[in-house]
């Protein structure tokens, strides 16, 4: 499951959705999130992807690396910006759109790469989870963002969405004791706990 495949997937779907129903005038956009039906695998995939997204957007070096990986140096190429999914994309600067797009692609790639030699069934599940994240959650992640600090708003939206996804996943798990270890169902996140802890110190600091 290579990063190249991931980039092809993201750029190939850039025109597939209209974000009008997630505009700033919509009341409580998280209502749509609660109505999205998904499997436990897909929910787990999203939780891990959002954790990576928050970390990448919180650490300058990781964001720079994400931009480099995603664009392969082609910083001005508009096909690398998933504008059709970003809420009120016309109001975003090119720089913010590029940063967000690179970060979300890197996050999905990092989670996808954890599945070594996936079966055809797993590949389909990964593809489905990616579709849900890009089609349904990117508009939510980018809704009601501060024009002066888009990425901070995205991180805050991501944190809220992730908490709701975790709460929903807990409801689906028959044995609550499994959650005594908060990372037991999210093994990919566990590998980034140290990085996330560092990122937390700058999450609401001077980071753009």
UniProtKB/Swiss-Prot annotation:
Keywords from the named record: Host membrane, Membrane, Secreted, Transmembrane, Transmembrane helix, Virulence
Protein's UniProt keywords contain Secreted: yes
Residue intervals passing through the bilayer: 184-204
Compartments, as annotated in UniProt: Secreted; Host vacuole, Host pathogen-containing vacuole, Host pathogen-containing vacuole membrane
UniProt-reported outcome of changing residue 68 to A: Results in attenuation of L.pneumophila in amoeba
Known outcome of mutating residue 78 to A: Results in attenuation of L.pneumophila in both hMDMs and amoeba. Vacuoles cannot be remodeled by the ER and are fused to the lysosomes, leading to bacterial degradation
Residue positions of motif NPxY eukaryotic motif: 77-80
Domain statement: Contains a C-terminal transmembrane helix, three copies of tyrosine-based sorting motifs, and an NPxY eukaryotic motif, which binds phosphotyrosine-binding domains present on signaling and adapter eukaryotic proteins. The NPxY eukaryotic motif is essential for ER-mediated remodeling and lysosomal evasion by the LCV.
Subunit structure: Homotrimer.
Full protein name: Effector protein MavE
Organism the protein comes from: Legionella pneumophila subsp. pneumophila (strain Philadelphia 1 / ATCC 33152 / DSM 7513)
């Amino acid at each position: 499951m290579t990063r190249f495949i991931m980039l092809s997937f993201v750029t190939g779907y850039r025109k597939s959705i209209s974000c009008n129903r997630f505009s700033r005038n919509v009341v409580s956009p998280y209502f749509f999130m609660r109505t999205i039906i998904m499997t436990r695998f897909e929910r787990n995939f999203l939780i891990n992807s959002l954790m990576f997204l928050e970390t990448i957007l919180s650490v300058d070096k990781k964001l720079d690396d994400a931009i480099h990986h995603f664009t392969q140096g082609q910083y001005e190429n508009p096909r690398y910006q998933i504008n059709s999914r970003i809420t009120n994309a016309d109001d975003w600067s090119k720089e913010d759109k590029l940063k967000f797009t690179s970060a979300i692609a890197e996050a999905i790639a990092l989670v996808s790469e954890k599945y070594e030699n996936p079966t055809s069934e797993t590949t389909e599940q990964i593809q489905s989870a990616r579709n849900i994240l890009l089609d349904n959650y990117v508009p939510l992640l980018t809704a009601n963002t501060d024009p002066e600090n888009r990425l901070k708003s995205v991180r805050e939206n991501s944190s809220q969405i992730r908490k709701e996804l975790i709460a929903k996943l807990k409801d689906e798990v028959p044995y609550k004791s499994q959650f005594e270890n908060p990372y037991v169902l999210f093994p990919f996140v566990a590998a980034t706990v140290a990085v996330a802890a560092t990122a937390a110190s700058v999450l609401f600091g001077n980071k753009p």
